[in-house]
Amino acid sequence: MKFFASCAKGLEYLLADELLALGASKATATISGVNVEGELRDAQRAVLWSRLASRVLWPLSEFDCPDEDALYAGVAELPWDAHLSVGHTLSVDAHVSGTAITHARYAAQRIKDAVVDTMRRQGLERPSVDVESPDLRLNLSLRKGRATISVDLGGGPLHRRGWRMAQNEAPLKENLAAAVLMRGGWPRAYADGGGLLDPMCGSGTLLIEGALMAADVAPGLQRYGSDLPSRWRGFDRNGWQQLVSEARERDSVGRAALKQVIHGSDMDPHAIRAAKENAQVAGVAEAIWFGVCEVGELQTPPQATGVVVCNPPYDERLAADAALYRRLGDTLQCAVPQWRASLLCGNAELAYATGLRAGKKYQLFNGAIECALIVCDPIAVPRRTPLAAPTALSEGAQMVANRLRKNLQKFKKWRAREGVECFRAYDADLPEYSAAIDVYQQADGDRRIFLHVQEYAAPATIPEADVRRRLNELLAAAREVFEVPAERVALKSRERGKGGSKYGRFEQRNEIVHVREHGALLRVNLFDYLDTGLFLDHRPLRGTMAQQSRGRRFLNLFCYTGVASVEAAVAGAASTTSVDLSGTYLQWCADNLALNGLAGSKHKLVQADALAWLEAERAHFDVIFCDPPTFSNSARAEDFDIQRAHVRLLRAAVARLAPGGVLYFSNNFRRFKLDEEGVAEFAQCEDISPRTIDPDFERHARIHRAWRLTA
């Protein structure tokens, strides 16, 4: 069985690791959460023990939902007497995007109506609504025409631990505090005898969370007490009581052994008073020392090593003044130089202002606020030790750098909303600097940034010296803006010679980088070939097909490295079939599937000429993706020309559609003209090109065209 654990953006990979450690069979990070394979007991264990999850959602139903009537009908089909007891209360949380239903509150109301009407038809008492503490809390996720109705097993936000009595302004949520502690290595540091320090502790969230982690206290124990998290009729009450009993035993042992190695201070006496009250309620007051002092007056703790955790203020008034962050960095280097630091800063600029060298950087969200988490190990290492003074950017390079920063700001909200980690940051925005810069963020390890720079052909009238200078300026600007060393920049430059401009020899590094898109892990090779293994412009189309492939048969023609197949499989496709003439690409596809734990007869790889295979095949498919090359010639197949062959190709593909199936056809031939009359003989065809272009490709929206065909 699969369930979903939601979390704040930026915590997905950390949460996946935590859920695996708690016993889940499989955990795959996606946007703002993790798809989990496990039993109901695993989900209930996550409710009790997860320090990072926001909610744990157990699915009841999933269905196509093009409009409000489909939503009502889909909910009304469920046997609500098996889920909600007579006399119990109900509440619905809804999240909608990319759908005809645009208001979440209206969607929630339609679900309530469907539940109430269904129970009335069964002769049962009408359930009441209780927004604060319902017996059954439902959750709707409605995305791109697909609805999922789930039970919120925790009954509400899991960051509420049950100990917070008072708080200062802008409190840090407990699950984000847990992430700061985990990234800082606090559990291991405590086991090794280290201390914990927060010199700006506010109401004590980081320190109290750290003490509870050290004492092995389950986050859900105090939240629920002797109550059940949910009175859903499918909830395993006996299993829950067993989990709680085990957690209480661990709680008793852990609290008794808790060492007094945690120190907190703040310049605000009211905040310290609140922190002490919270620690008292949490039962860890004896383990934490609190004191009132300004950050510059910080005293060195008795422990030789440990972890500094801190969430310095970053409201609008303080964000403009980096002096506080500089003072924090200077103080830590003097007081605890050999300690490790995990600092949640308001943004990258404020993190830089600390003067500390970050070995690792993470992007997190505190509510809607984007933050920068830096980890320094040890604190004493200076941020920079250059061998020579850095070279200032030239005027031209500075222009490119400014444009890159402008683009990054423009894409910021879109990337955060959609979870985009690989994107086009620059596409010849300044005509004299004619190149594309694609950003690939590593999905594992240190989450490093790689750049893929592809130079466009310059007019023959421009001197070669100017072409080289401009390319070097563009590279210098990109490396500065993204803080990327030269060895993580893949350059595909053009050389002039007989026959005009062409790409020169590529590096042969055989270096594979794992990236993520729509929840799928993918292998890319940035250095060895012209293409990387991932066509970024097709991102939105792949997302649409993945959503529509859940529980359906997916066919990928001219599959290349199989990215669309992998994303469909990760989204829950019943089966995938990937066809390509190239054995090299099929092996790449197989590697991508294996990377996501997808293998076996459900996911077929076929080495064949796609057109010939289609005309001989008899199986049917629900979703077909056809993205052929413009031209192709091979000793093993007849020559292919998309303009000449597309009607024959599409006719053969439409013939393989199951009833209600859909074919997505795309190509990047700029001069391609669809034979509308020829296609109309066997299919209904809609040009959907504008809907398949994300913001990072809007500058050159004709990079591809796409059509939706139905029989």
Swiss-Prot record:
Top-level taxonomic group: Bacteria
First-tier enzyme category under EC: transferase
Function: Specifically methylates the guanine in position 2445 (m2G2445) and the guanine in position 2069 (m7G2069) of 23S rRNA.
Reactions listed under catalytic activity: guanosine(2445) in 23S rRNA + S-adenosyl-L-methionine = N(2)-methylguanosine(2445) in 23S rRNA + S-adenosyl-L-homocysteine + H(+); guanosine(2069) in 23S rRNA + S-adenosyl-L-methionine = N(2)-methylguanosine(2069) in 23S rRNA + S-adenosyl-L-homocysteine + H(+)
PANTHER family cross-referenced by the UniProt entry: RIBOSOMAL RNA LARGE SUBUNIT METHYLTRANSFERASE K/L (PTHR47313), RIBOSOMAL RNA LARGE SUBUNIT METHYLTRANSFERASE K_L (PTHR47313:SF1)
Protein family (similarity comment): Belongs to the methyltransferase superfamily. RlmKL family.
Sequence ranges assigned to domain THUMP in this UniProt record: 42-153
Gene Ontology molecular function terms on file: 23S rRNA (guanine(2445)-N(2))-methyltransferase activity; RNA binding; rRNA (guanine-N7-)-methyltransferase activity
Main location: cytoplasm
Cellular-component GO terms for this entry: cytoplasm
Natural source organism: Xanthomonas oryzae pv. oryzae (strain PXO99A)
EC number: 2.1.1.173, 2.1.1.264
Keywords of this entry: Cytoplasm, Methyltransferase, RNA-binding, rRNA processing, S-adenosyl-L-methionine, Transferase
Gene expressing this chain: rlmL
Name used for this protein in its record: Ribosomal RNA large subunit methyltransferase K/L
Record NCBIfam families: PRK11783.1
Record's subcellular location: Cytoplasm
UniProt cross-references to SUPFAM superfamilies, sorted A to Z: S-adenosyl-L-methionine-dependent methyltransferases
